[in-house]
């Protein structure tokens, strides 16, 4: 559910050994003209009309031969499509084509299907060759707007006279200080983030943090033992656990051995050594004193004489007690665990705590269809989710841009649907999307910010901390899928950490990868076995209904009139169920059927002009909305009959169908609360009607939205910008209080028609889910950057029962939520981020490569110079801030205002415990 409406040498196209390209030609040596081309994309002006902006592409010829006036085609992807592909009925399209014609070039859809974000620029009659040493700037009108560098065209590759294409690298330029580059429209009053703006917003100051708040999510209640400590000795401590907590004991043993020298032997025979960690169950455990047992609750006791006891209401409760214990181990122990100076002990404060979650559903969704993530990357993320007590992990494995799970009996889904490349007719694979297409050799990708590589960094390797030009140059995994065995291992790995895996197969829209794969299958069998060819076919090729999705597709919806559509879906779900059944530890809970982002009816038609719809007596005469009802009723039934509960996006209930269908029991996830779009209250409407709702609101819970408005940030911005504070401040039972400003910075107007939750409706809100869609997840580093520390804010809201009350500001100008943020930001700055810097995957069965640390976003500091004095603060008090007066050659820790009146240049940055730094920023005098 991701709206998207809204540098440099040529390198060789390389073959990828594990796949065959039998009918496609690929270059093995660079073209002598092409290998000297450089490209630069610039934003020029947003103030040229509604929903369009002006950009430019500069082609520089550094070679010895001219780039001729004909015979070449420059291909690229763009999430901001050229306006020239708009129809004649749209004046913007007419004007854009005239603009290009005056420059003697054209831009059109590149692929035969004219579907998606793939385009080609070609010279037309009158084009003047670009001679050696010359540059040519081509002005291009594009749709919507570009606020961030990663909105730029990407994945450029050039073909000469129909020969195999080769990658051409592009650089990107945007000026953060130029409103023409960063102001979406005249209505956009949201400023670009600056050091001065951050300085004003960073109102939290460093404060002491109690044990209750040293953990994320914070503990429900704590009874400290004043001044008492337990010295946990690795050589002495053992783990005492019954057989039914063997999994939890193994996990704890592995986690402690990662941090502290020692064996931490597991003792299940009830022998009591001198120092013990005891795990036990108490099915009657009541953590909040209301007289009833609390699912997933636990009691953690650290006693200087009796050791550590973790008592859980259930196995999950014991496991979450272990996570709390892990987080309470001092940061220095984490730091030294990755060195030759690994600690032999850990000193822990003595106390007793009780804890239990607010919501039963605490989730995260990861889209692996747009950019594939390896099994090992998934393992690491699952372990991190467990660390913060997340218990649901949704994997979007099937979408327009890729099918990522092997389905026995339908090998074409991954033979074709898990590959992207240069295939204009899509005979062997999907065409390239979003600049991620395997086959193009592009060097070594993410490099880290070069300005952070100085002597002062003491050799610490740079890590991704914002836009790098590699993102636009074939970074990303267009190819890849999980085998059945891979997925079984993922299920087991997650189950061992008390996380349920929820697969998402998105239908009837967002199904392009499946559709094209089944057309590939159809063509494979049509001449030899027509029955087999049609067995899983998903479309009516004669359907003349026309639609255009938010992601620019014209062919991504399966047809409900074909019985083969439902044969296909039944096969997919039955094979999926077999995978779950083969892993005894895995819970068979929900399966997500999608149902989102069908283009709005009126300007679009879905199936009304399909001959097969009219020929089928079951579907003949039905409207598109009625056909959707018919489809989703059967789709939900297939999921349910295979033993899964049916999850869907809220679109299924809000606008796709007639509103009169009975889909059976649904568990909807509502994403569309974008301020001003008119759907802000829909989650409450359906919770009040009795649906078990998972809140997934884009404005606060979409991790793939950029942290803030600045061209160097990564992500999207169609619903605004989302940082850790915005996730933390999310109010599940009063979402309207979340809406201070809209995505353009304008105050949100109160709507008296907004529906509020009833008391019964509150009971039907079963949890929260953070979403991470994959368009920009072109490396694991980027994935971690967008997820952390946003995830910590969502974890806090999903677990902690006590929300800050909504009250007026106090004498200091702060509300209860402000004060809660002050505490939480200190928790991150003083405790949580230090541990994320060094955390190791708890790898019980040696499944994950030896790795440690998380590439979380390091916040840029706030800074101003007032009367010659430099003042710096930080979003997370406790993080080190530094300044440089010699253009980054040396960095000085900041302790208080410092005279910089003599300095020609002043730079600031934040630095982590390991020496990683944020992006640097110059502060104007």
Task: Show the residue positions of the predicted features.
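Asparagine-centered strand-capping/turn motif at beta-strand->loop junctions
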Residues: 58-66
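Feature activates predominantly on carbohydrate-active enzymes
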Residues: 291, 295, 303-555, 564, ...
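Active-site neighborhood of glycoside hydrolase catalytic domains
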Residues: 549-665, 673, 677-678
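Acidic, contiguous N-terminal accessory segments
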Residues: 152, 158-335, 339-357, 647-654, ...
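Flexible, acidic glycine-rich loops studded with aromatic residues
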Residues: 645-868
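Low-complexity, acidic Ser/Thr/Pro/Gly-rich terminal tails and inter-domain linkers that flank the onset
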Residues: 28-51
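Terminal connector regions
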Residues: 52, 108-118, 127-190
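Short, compositionally stereotyped local motifs that mark structural "simplifiers"
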Residues: 238, 819-925
